[in-house]
Amino acid sequence: MRVDSIGEGENAIIVLDKTPFYGEGGGQVGDTGVMESGSFSADVDNTTKNPSGTIYLHACTVKSGSINVGAEVSTAVDEERRADITRNHTAAHLLQSALREVLGNHVQQAGQLVSDDYFRFDFTHFEALTAKELIEVQNLVNKKILEAIPVTTQEMPIEEAKKLGAMALFGEKYGDVVRVVSAGDFSVEFCGGTHVKNTANLGLFRIRQEGSVAAGVRRIEALTGMGVLKYINGMSAVIMDVCSLLKIANPKAVVEGVQKAEQLIKEQQREINELNSKLAVAQIGQLFAGT
């Protein structure tokens, strides 16, 4: 339902004649931020686009004041969140190229979600990745980050892009002119999303999880930048808790400590089973003695 004005506490979709907000698309989530005009203030909770991609729809929650159709507003994108999303999107491109280099050119993108806290990448492959393959892929992406490769964007005719070997995004439809995002010659893809200026801006890359989502389709969840540090800190805290429980000073001895604890549990279970057997024999003896 179209309305001419909105006020405090109301939720609405606001359309602007121009916007700095990125509208959800290509697997990348939409931007958030704020919109203001005088006493009017609203949180932009999400940004999407109409089916043709020509109109940007800002899902807003009015925090104060009111506003009418035709009013001028100032906008501000949540830049920290956008930066996290941007790092993850470029990392998704590097990940696809790394997977193709490690596993083979049969790997094709089968979907993705790029958000601020992590990204997931679906791809065609016939079996689970081994621990060695996961480390190899992860190391290759981090190697490209350390190489500080400039990331460039260029619009060109689609046929020219195909000649360059640019990879297309799964499920996307393209016009005669496409936007190509390149990280040197390591990664060349059609893409309309946001990206860093240099692979070094990613900081770090870490695979969090790998699994199956369908027959012949695998999924990797991964992190970049501060997300990697938070993940490592969380894992370190768990390891230190385990060390404390096992009374181990050196974290490198955790595996040995767990193995010893497992062996102790097995021995105690064997002793319990022996005691139960002896108890059962004694009870049977008492039963017969009473007859």
Which stretches of residues belong to each language-model region?
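Short, hydrophobic beta-strand segments
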Residues: 57-61, 75-81, 118-128, 222, ...
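Active/ligand-binding-proximal structured segments within catalytic/core domains
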Residues: 22-35, 68-123
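Conserved nucleotide-binding/hydrolysis modules and their immediate coupling elements
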Residues: 1-75, 80
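Terminal appendage regions of diverse proteins
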Residues: 106, 199-291
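Generic, well-ordered alpha-helical scaffold segments in large soluble proteins
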Residues: 34-35, 76, 94-102, 136-147, ...
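A generic structural motif
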Residues: 20, 64, 79-83, 93, ...
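Short helix/loop capping segments that flank catalytic or ligand/cofactor-binding pockets
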Residues: 22-25, 32, 85, 131-132, ...
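Non-catalytic interaction/regulatory segments
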Residues: 106, 116-213
